[in-house]
């Protein structure tokens, strides 16, 4: 591959392939020209976020060019219950966030990022109140609530379920000024 003719070296071939990739393969549509860079804290807290540990994480990631900082699952967990079994009520944990989620949102902004929060809005875990107390909001088949691996699913055709989720999700996004879900 050391032929001296123009265009016949391995370097030249690699350069041409790279130019092709830059022009055609990497060309994103207009809607994808600016996609935000976000940090999701899940792999640092493993579903046990708290205001205290988020402060430490913010200190470590601020100034790194991140646009959003997302608080993942567990922000609503009740003492002694795994987050996956308690989701659906979405009431912030006073134990983990004694100053409230608004204080976390403020701290994220002070670190130069926009706050985001995780919701899994389609289902409820068996330890949540909505799971057992609001079966009317869940999907039914043949008169029975559909349950899969201990999870129940909100009936998105039910106006009461939509109202419940709007209150829980949209209400908290607005209340605590979260910009990403």
Predicted feature locations:
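Acidic-and-aromatic substrate-binding clefts and catalytic sites of carbohydrate-active enzymes
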Residues: 46-50, 94-98, 124
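Surface-exposed, active-site-proximal loop segments in enzymatic domains
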Residues: 79-93
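Soluble or luminal CAZymes and related metallo-dependent hydrolases
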Residues: 53, 96, 100, 160-165
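Active-site-adjacent "subsite" loops/lids of carbohydrate-active enzymes
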Residues: 34-36, 43-47, 114-178
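Glycine-rich, aromatic-flanked loop segments that form ligand/cofactor-binding clefts
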Residues: 7-26, 66-73, 97-149
């Amino acid at each position: 591959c050391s032929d001296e003719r123009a265009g016949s070296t391995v370097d030249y071939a690699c350069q041409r392939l790279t130019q092709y990739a830059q022009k055609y393969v990497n060309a994103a549509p207009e809607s994808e020209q600016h996609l935000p860079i976000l940090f999701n804290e899940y792999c640092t807290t493993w579903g046990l976020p708290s205001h205290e540990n988020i402060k430490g994480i913010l200190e470590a990631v601020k100034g790194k060019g991140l646009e959003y900082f997302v608080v993942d699952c567990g922000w609503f967990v009740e003492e002694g219950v795994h987050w996956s079994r308690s989701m659906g009520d979405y009431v912030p944990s006073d134990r983990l966030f004694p100053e409230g989620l608004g204080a976390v949102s403020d701290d994220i902004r002070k670190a130069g990022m926009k706050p985001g929060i995780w919701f899994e809005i389609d289902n409820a875990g068996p330890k949540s109140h909505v799971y057992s107390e609001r079966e009317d909001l869940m999907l039914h088949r043949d008169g029975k609530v559909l349950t899969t691996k201990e999870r129940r699913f909100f009936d998105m055709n039910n106006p009461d379920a939509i109202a419940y989720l709007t209150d829980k999700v949209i209400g908290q996004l607005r209340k605590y000024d979260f910009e990403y879900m």
